[in-house]
A protein has these predicted regions:
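Amphipathic alpha-helical dimerization/coiled-coil segments
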Residues: 4, 89-111
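N-terminal helix-turn-helix DNA-binding core of bacterial DNA-binding proteins
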Residues: 5-50, 77
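Generic structural signal for secondary-structure transition and capping sites
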Residues: 19, 31, 63, 96-99, ...
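Short, hydrophobic secondary-structure boundary micro-motifs
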Residues: 35, 67, 106-107
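Residues on one face of amphipathic alpha-helical coiled coils
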Residues: 38, 57, 86, 93-96
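Basic amphipathic alpha-helical segments that dock to polyanions
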Residues: 51, 55-58
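Beta-hairpin "wing" of winged helix-turn-helix
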Residues: 59-79
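Basic, amphipathic "hinge/linker" alpha-helix immediately C-terminal to the N-terminal HTH DNA-binding motif
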Residues: 72-93
Length: 111
């Protein structure tokens, strides 16, 4: 039996640390967008460098778009693209499955 090449490529994205969580996080934000500082605050254990690298990766895959808003001061937000939102929609059933079947192994509690 051959493995689906599309699924294999998708797991190259989702199999990398933080990518799925960032996509899921943005999908739950107003307008599917957030400031870097909000993501850093809410994704508590990610370092600023790792977050920056992950957002760049996701932008290269056209899942996230960096938008610069010309205000004073200038604001930068990260927004899920249509492609990113479609992937986030596919992750929601996985999240529901995890809430039913995955046991948390540390001090985290479900939100």
């Amino acid at each position: 039996m051959e493995i689906c090449p599309y699924l294999e490529e998708t797991f190259k994205i989702l199999g990398r640390s933080w990518n799925g969580l960032i996509i899921n996080y943005l999908s739950r934000c107003n307008d599917c967008s957030a400031h870097f500082s909000d993501m850093k605050r809410d994704l508590k254990t990610i370092t600023p460098r790792a977050l920056s690298l992950k957002l760049s990766e996701l932008a290269q895959w056209e899942l996230v778009e960096k938008q610069i808003i010309s205000t004073s001061p200038v604001q930068i937000i990260y927004v899920l693209t249509e492609k990113g939102q479609a992937l986030a929609d596919a992750l929601h059933p996985i999240e529901a499955w995890a809430q039913t079947y995955v046991e948390l192994t540390d001090q985290r509690t479900a939100k």
